[in-house]
A protein has these predicted regions:
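Zinc-dependent deaminase catalytic domain
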Residues: 1-98
Length: 98
């Protein structure tokens, strides 16, 4: 299992929320976005969507940072999938990833 994390920040760089991927939890936003992206079977929470649903004040969200780590804990290349890209575009956020 690879660990993926996402951090949503405001314009000043303050952390608004942190999310991580889950192989057991889902959310209606994840299910809707997966359906719209043509991948309805990808219903388990992605880190980006987990971070977004945890933001208390969406109007302050400015950027999202995405990180992925291998089994040894080393950072590896990460980028939002097409499901998460759709939601990030809806939120009009800047994206930074490893």
């Amino acid at each position: 299992m690879q660990a993926v994390s996402a951090i949503v920040r405001d314009k000043r760089g303050r952390v608004l929320s942190v999310g991580k991927n889950s192989y057991t939890k889902t959310h209606p936003l994840q299910a809707r976005a997966a359906q719209e992206a043509g991948e309805p079977y990808k219903v388990y929470l992605h880190a980006e969507i987990d971070a977004l649903i945890r933001v208390r004040n969406p109007d302050k969200a400015h950027t999202i940072h995405v990180y992925r780590y291998d089994k040894a804990g080393n950072p590896v290349k990460a980028a939002p999938c097409k499901i998460c890209q759709r939601v990030i575009r809806e939120w009009n956020l800047q994206v930074f990833h490893t």
